[in-house]
């Protein structure tokens, strides 16, 4: 359809591509609301990259990242990258319900002293017990943009996008703060399974309207009075899956269309005690103090986490 050349910063010009009517993405229905395109990226000195399933929505700017692997690199690139169905259109396992606040036991299951925004999230591409699944080190903001682009449509009202991004970030920061998976003996922050966490898709495209919201509020999370940890804000689509006392994605779209603000949408589902809080930023992957200093010659899980 198109052949483009990147500029000095590695970006192409914007192009327009056909997509289904925008209204398909504003109400649940049987028609796929986005077009799918295949992208081939080639550059001298690099291995070619094929991406299958880039999603394009009507009236929305899609951004397709493409990280190339050098010819001299002995590690083959993932080729092709296949982007599966969007969670609102495809079939995925429903979220297994959890308590929105994790217990703080005397044994110290929760030991991070403050809520922090990690520089990097370690994403396990599968269920927690799937030892064959890969772990990916993903910058926090890139992770949130990917998840939001996989979980909601970028054509939705900005207040709806903001409410959903806040829920995604608070859920993620709860996993960081509680060291949920590390305390179970795993070396990752979160999974890509919708049954346990939310959907992250390796190599997928994101959307400009979602990216802008994340950049504006990436250090925010959701709180309740007297609770230190970010709230584990669970949600579902509200059409294929029902989830009382959780936010429904299609319902949040409707509320945004009615003029509800982000916090009004969130309180509609999670209650009036919910409020927006701000976290500290931090470099690296947060991990609690192991009970002893790490020095030259130290070994074990805590050293591996820091590495």
Task: Mark where each language-model region is.
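A short, solvent-exposed beta-strand micro-motif common in secreted/extracellular proteins
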Residues: 22-45
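Conserved, single-site charged/polar hotspot
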Residues: 17, 40-53, 58-307
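Surface-exposed coil/turn segments at beta-strand junctions on protein surfaces, enriched
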Residues: 5-7, 30-34, 57-59
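Short, conserved glycine- and acidic-residue-centered signature motifs
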Residues: 10, 32, 248
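Charged, low-complexity interaction regions that mediate assembly/partner binding
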Residues: 1-2, 80
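Short, acidic Ser/Thr/Gly-rich low-complexity loop/linker segments typical of extracellular
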Residues: 2-26
């Amino acid at each position: 359809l198109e052949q483009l050349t990147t500029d000095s910063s590695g970006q192409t010009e914007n192009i327009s591509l056909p997509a289904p009517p925008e209204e398909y993405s504003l109400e649940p229905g049987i028609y796929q609301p986005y077009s799918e395109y295949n992208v081939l990226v080639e550059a001298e000195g690099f291995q070619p990259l094929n991406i299958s399933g880039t999603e394009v929505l009507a009236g929305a700017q899609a951004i397709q990242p493409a990280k190339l692997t050098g010819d001299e690199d002995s590690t083959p690139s993932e080729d092709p990258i296949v982007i599966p169905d969007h969670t609102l259109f495809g079939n995925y396992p429903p979220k297994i319900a959890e308590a929105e606040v994790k217990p703080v036991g005397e044994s110290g299951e929760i030991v991070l002293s403050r809520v922090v925004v990690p520089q990097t999230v370690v994403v396990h591409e599968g269920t927690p017990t799937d030892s064959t699944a890969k772990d990916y080190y993903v910058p926090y903001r890139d992770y949130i943009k990917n998840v939001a682009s996989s979980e909601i449509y970028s054509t939705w009202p900005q207040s709806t996008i903001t409410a959903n991004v806040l829920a995604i970030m608070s859920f993620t920061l709860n996993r960081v703060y509680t060291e949920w998976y590390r305390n179970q003996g795993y070396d990752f922050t979160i999974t890509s399974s919708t049954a346990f966490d939310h959907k992250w898709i390796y190599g997928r495209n994101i959307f400009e309207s979602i990216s802008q919201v994340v950049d504006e509020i990436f250090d925010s999370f959701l709180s309740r009075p007297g609770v230190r940890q970010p709230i584990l804000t669970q949600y579902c689509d509200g059409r294929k899956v029902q989830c009382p006392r959780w936010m429904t994605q299609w319902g949040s779209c409707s509320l945004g269309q009615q003029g509800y603000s982000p916090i009004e949408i969130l309180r509609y589902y999670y209650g009036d005690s919910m409020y927006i809080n701000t976290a500290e930023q931090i470099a690296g992957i947060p991990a609690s103090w192991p009970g002893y200093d790490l020095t030259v010659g130290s070994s074990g899980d805590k050293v591996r986490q820091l590495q």
